[in-house]
Amino acid sequence: MYRAAHLNRRTFTKYIMFYYIVISFFSLWIVARSGYLYTGDDILFNINRIEELVATLENKSLISYISTFTSNQVGIATNIFYPNLWLYPFALLRIFFKNPIFSIYLGLGLLNFLTCIISHFTFKAFSGSFSKAFLFTNLYFFSTYRWIDLIRRFDISECIAIAVMPLIFWAFYETCYRDHTKWLWLAIGMALLLYAHILSFLIVTFFLVIIFLINLNKLTDFKTVILEVTKAILVFVLLTIGFLYTFLQTYLSITIQPPRIRDLSMTALKVGTLMQSTFENNIYKNGAHFNLGLMSFIVLLLAILFYSKLSSFYKQIIFLFIFCVLFATTLFPWSLMQTTGLTILQFPWRIFIIANLLFCVLGTKILGYVHLKHFDFASIAVITLLGLFTINQFFVFNEENTKLDASTDAYGSLFRHEKLKINQKSYRCLIPSNRNRDYTPINKRESEKRSTSVYNIVVSHQMLLGKRKLKVKKLQAIPNGVILQTPKISKRSSVSLPFYIYQKHNYKVLVNGKRKHFSVDRYRLLHIQLKDSKSTIMIQYIPSLTQVITIMISILSFSFLLFILLPKL
């Protein structure tokens, strides 16, 4: 009898996995069937990151530190400040299938499936119930905010963060309150989160600390918990030291242009707009469309109705959820926070990554209190159909977008939030279009106007000879570097080349095949003495021995966990 039940459970699991595969790719096919990508807030940034990695791999190099094939080809250290580990699958798919639109949607489909797998098995471990895990996975997969991130904003990094968050919160709960031996999963989850999205990592870390402090009196063995959390932190450091060392060393040694600081009181959501978008389940309209979806409102109403039946654990989730929602709105005193570290958020609604998970956990519990015939099946059907309908509405709403072509100023159009759609032919128009100054080195003594002026000179590939400007004759990208061909110079001159230098010891410069001494000017551009003739200059970023060692430590740590330790667990 046990064997029969075991076989039935295994068969049922296979059916569920097949269902997850179907919804993962069918939900994206609804959008992808026209052969277009639709413009999102972060599409330029992420397309450039993927294409940089593609070109790096195609040129037989494994790691991209600076952008030389994309992002204006001026050596911006995007991948030092914004980890790209999770983009390798997208890059490999892009290389294998050639069609960029198909490969990106295929990558997003795999991300969908990963979200299902992590959600299902972590919630199964948390609740001990297969059916609850299935319900939670459907709620989480079709959650409105996740789809806003995925297809409306094209924020791949935050979507990956959303995918791994159930693992983190489950491992945190187990480590602190139930099974202390699960600390290793906490370390792995936090490492995967850091490699996905630094801001999400900071938000999640902050909330874990808050939850830990709120529930300090519920720890049954404080010393053991502290020991296990310390072990998790140490393993986390081993897994991420390859990124953290280079990131911190570069960040602390120079001043960089941070992502734009915004007025939080202006980017916070108005309550009325949030409510309207919630009732509309809106993922497709321009403007203030950020919301948690109609299901979140239904779950909150049911939570209030069944409040007396809930344990203190779920009551706490209700209050945390309400706090997150209010935190994202103008009801929170954001004008008082403008001079604090909270400006790193840029948009208060980023906290919805927490609220989204909380409402799905709460919804799974609450829907279990509704005792109606076939309600379990009906609730799954409603969640699925509502999700698919909303995704289709996005497609219908954006199908009339203007086609991007070579004559379109892609960056300007996207900056003005114009609606565009991109096919395989026009995809290349996105690559040279990123004029974003984020992560470029800056001199705080220079005015904003002057810094912008110099940046525009640099991205147009002009050399600075005192007050004169000369266009580079030819530019060829190589992995983590470029080869420049200069025009003929009338006399021996000191020249600032259109290429950013972060830490001087990391760069090698060859002029006409010979190693050349160089300096760095006040704009952090490569400064060099050139003779009165044409020159071929190769500039390349070379990681230090310490950087290589830290990367190897992280690779070996992941390998040990993946091939030796985790199979035993």
PLM-predicted stretches and their roles:
Residues 228-229, 233-304, 421-427, 432-437:
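Periplasmic/ER-lumenal interhelical loops and adjacent helix-loop junctions
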Residues 12-52, 234-244, 387-393:
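Transmembrane signal-anchor helices characteristic of membrane glycosylation enzymes that use polyprenol
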Residues 9, 449-569:
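Active-site-proximal, structured, solvent-exposed surfaces of multi-pass membrane proteins
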Residues 26-122, 126, 131-164:
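Active-site lumenal/periplasmic loops and adjacent helix-entry segments of GT-C-fold
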Residues 20-24, 79, 107-126, 130-176, ...:
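Membrane-embedded helix bundles of polyisoprenyl
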